[in-house]
Amino acid sequence: CIRDSYTSVWDQAKAAVKDLYGGAMGVFIPAVSLASKVKFGYSFREASALNQIRRCKIPVLFIHGEADALVPCAMVYRLYEAANCDKQLLTVPGAGHCLSASVAPKLYWSAVRSFIERYIDR
């Protein structure tokens, strides 16, 4: 199950800069990405859920709040489309970041339960 996940650190940083500063990222994101590469061994572009989900072979339930102000909901559609496994998508109207279960508990838990039941032998 993936909830409110970004496609990559690079995409998330771009979205945050756009929201906070109107989109002018200048050298900030590339500089921090380079610092990450030096210190941790990977750049923001390499820290990519999008690249990882393409290799996933297990079933994935994607859940995202449509009113997520932190991670744009559009990212879940890119992740869903990139997944080459059995998958299901649930977007929750009015739900902010990681609030899908709180905003629509019946919808959320029904989706989780039915998804899990598809893969559990009874």
Per-range role (PLM):
Residues 3-45, 51-52, 91:
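Hydrolase active-site cap/lid region
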Residues 4, 64, 97:
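Histidine-centered divalent metal-coordination motifs
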Residues 11-14, 73-74, 102:
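Short, well-ordered secondary-structure micro-motifs
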Residues 49, 58, 72-81:
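Short alpha-helix in the alpha/beta-hydrolase fold that links the catalytic acid
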Residues 55-57, 62-64, 68:
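Short beta-strand/loop motif that positions the catalytic acidic residue
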Residues 66-71, 98-99:
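Acidic catalytic loop of the alpha/beta-hydrolase fold
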Residues 80-100, 111:
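Catalytic histidine neighborhood in serine/cysteine hydrolases
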Residues 103-122:
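Catalytic active-site module of serine/aspartate enzymes centered on a nucleophile-bearing elbow/loop
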